[in-house]
Amino acid sequence: MKASELREKSVEELNAELLGLLREQFNLRMQHATGQLTQTNQLKLVRRNIARVKTIITSKAGA
């Protein structure tokens, strides 16, 4: 998801998005640990998306 799309969302929607991303990260980590994950780049993408959402939440809280 692009940062511009995230900036348009409310804080509540961003928190819901963050929760979904954290769950996805957990599932990907479990798949990676059991050797079922074939696209390991997904871990990196989800981690960066989490950082994007957290950054925007922080900037909205300060504004």
UniProtKB/Swiss-Prot annotation:
Q: Which PROSITE patterns match?
A: RIBOSOMAL_L29 (PS00579)
Query: Pfam families attached here?
Result: Ribosomal_L29
Please indicate if the UniProt record lists Ribosomal protein as a keyword.
Answer: yes
Q: Does the keyword Chloroplast apply?
A: no
Biological process (GO) annotations? translation
Keywords annotated in UniProt:
Ribonucleoprotein, Ribosomal protein
Gene Ontology terms for molecular function: structural constituent of ribosome
Q: Which GO terms describe its cellular component?
A: cytosolic large ribosomal subunit
| InterPro entries in alphabetical order | Ribosomal_protein_uL29, Ribosomal_uL29, Ribosomal_uL29_CS, Ribosomal_uL29_sf
NCBIfam families membership: L29
The entry assigns this protein to a family as follows: Belongs to the universal ribosomal protein uL29 family.
> What's the protein here called?
Large ribosomal subunit protein uL29
